[in-house]
């Protein structure tokens, strides 16, 4: 593990090169500048291409899962070529490379899924036989659960690509994270926001996570003011739930925690890819037990589903 390049005078932020990833990196830079009175040239953003960005013709579940979006960036972090990495937390595996951790979560944006419709504004108002594009197994399963009459097609690409395909009439509607659209200034394209009690989001959705080297005390001090208490607590629960279920891009898993004062509420769900089977679990407790609540919820929902629920489709 290399020493921090920030010792040479510039903090280096690693990120994917998409518009959304860059918007999140620029937000992180601005927050660091405001927290520490740093000039703009004290922080450099280094866009990187990842395997997940390059492979666009197949579902992520077929080619390696969430790690495809992080491997190259994490190697740069381990090598000392960058000091921190900025990620969409929902894209992060629960097991990180040795020596790295998600040290800080920024204040969460709206975690809900957004529907962008062409033939109907509301998802539930789509005509029978309509076509919806999504590459997320969770969204595909939820769509099939709620509207088994709808055809779901694989739909990859960045936000611009997906919206362009929609405008071209390739599908009648698509789903994107509300948070990403808002960060890109595209909230006006949203035609429907899905109720998380009916269409629960992915664990970590809407939250930006900052990955750093374990034991890099100077970086820890720099990042500390950016940590958002409620988001940190909620994601401790959600990621514990995901991790206990061995969640990846190959598993339709949903989960959302909310924090009020010293109390936490959590709702999680696991589904079969066809949406025909779904098992839901809820949990409540004190915030200090966030991770334990997530793990316990995962154990309970796994027991509900039975030992063969995951067979044949992981």
UniProtKB/Swiss-Prot annotation:
Any Pfam family: Porphobil_deam
Modification S-(dipyrrolylmethanemethyl)cysteine, positions: 249
Pathway in which this enzyme or protein is active: Porphyrin-containing compound metabolism; protoporphyrin-IX biosynthesis; coproporphyrinogen-III from 5-aminolevulinate: step 2/4
EC code: 2.5.1.61
GO CC terms of this entry: cytoplasm
Needed cofactors: dipyrromethane
The record's free-text note on cofactor binding: Binds 1 dipyrromethane group covalently.
A GO molecular-function descriptor: hydroxymethylbilane synthase activity
Enzyme class: transferase
One of the protein's GO biological processes: protoporphyrinogen IX biosynthetic process
NCBIfam families associated with the record: hemC
PANTHER family assigned: PORPHOBILINOGEN DEAMINASE
Subunit structure: Monomer.
Name this polypeptide is given: Porphobilinogen deaminase
Gene from which the chain derives: hemC
